[in-house]
Regions:
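Extracytoplasmic "Venus flytrap"
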Residues: 30-58, 64-77, 95-98, 168-172
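Periplasmic-binding protein-like
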Residues: 87-95, 113-117
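Hydrophobic alpha-helical
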Residues: 93-109
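Short, charged beta->alpha transition segments
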Residues: 102, 122-127, 144-152
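Short, well-structured alpha-helical segments in soluble
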Residues: 73-88
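Flexible loop/hinge segments that line or gate small-molecule binding clefts
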Residues: 107-139
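An alpha-beta-alpha
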Residues: 52, 145-172
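Short, low-complexity disordered leader/linker segments with a strong preference
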Residues: 1-29
Length: 172
C-alpha cells in the first residue's frame, strides 16, 4: 500500500512539473474528491487524502478535498467542475463511482490532469472505457489476491470454499 501511495505522490510531482513555466508564480491546487465516504473513513478515501495532503505539504502545493452533495454521475461531475473552477490542476478520484463523470471530465478539461484509483473512465456504464492523455488510472489486481487466498485455503486442506462480496462488481 505504501508503494501505491508513493506512486501517487511521484505522479503528482510529474503533473506539477508539467504545468510549470519559467518565471511564473503560479500555484497549483490538487483536488481530491471523495466518492461516498469521508476523508476520515479509515479506508480508501482517507488513504488517498492523506497521500494528497502529505504531497501538498512537502511540496508547498495547495490542496483541498471535496465531498460531493450527490453521488450520482451528474453530482460527481458537478463536484469536479467546482474543483476545476477553484483552480485545481490535478484531480484525484478514488473509487469506481467516478467512472462516468471522469469519462466526461477528461474531455471537458484537457488542461487538467486526472488520477483515477481502481477504475478506468467509462462511458455511461456501456463498458466502453477511455483513458485520455490527461488521465492516469491505477488499477488493483483483485483477482490475484483472491486466487492466492483460495489456493492457500486448498493447500491447508479445505475443499469446500465460499465467498461473499459486498457489491455486484466485476472485481467482486
Amino acid at each position: 500500500m505504501k508503494k501505491f501511495f508513493a506512486s501517487i505522490l511521484c505522479l503528482g510531482m510529474i503533473f506539477g512539473a508539467t504545468g510549470c513555466t519559467s518565471g511564473g508564480d503560479d500555484t497549483y491546487e490538487i483536488a481530491m474528491i471523495t466518492d461516498s465516504g469521508s476523508v476520515t473513513d479509515k479506508s480508501f478515501n482517507q488513504s488517498a487524502y492523506e497521500g494528497v495532503k502529505e504531497f501538498g505539504e512537502k511540496n508547498d502545493i495547495t490542496y483541498k478535498y471535496y465531498a460531493p452533495k450527490d453521488t450520482d454521475q451528474a453530482g460527481l461531475l458537478s463536484t469536479i467542475d467546482d474543483a476545476v473552477d477553484n483552480g485545481a490542476k490535478v484531480v484525484v478520484t478514488p473509487g469506481f463511482n467516478f467512472s462516468g463523470a471522469l469519462y466526461q471530465a477528461q474531455e471537458k478539461y484537457p488542461d487538467v490532469k486526472f488520477v483515477t484509483i481502481d477504475f478506468e473512465p467509462q462511458k455511461d456504464g456501456s463498458g466502453e472505457t477511455k483513458v485520455g492523455d490527461n488521465t492516469v488510472s491505477y488499477l488493483f489486481s483483485e483477482q490475484e489476491s483472491g486466487y492466492v487466498a483460495g489456493y492457500a485455503a486448498v493447500k491447508e486442506g479445505y475443499t469446500k470454499l465460499g465467498f461473499m462480496g459486498g457489491m455486484a462488481l466485476p472485481a467482486v
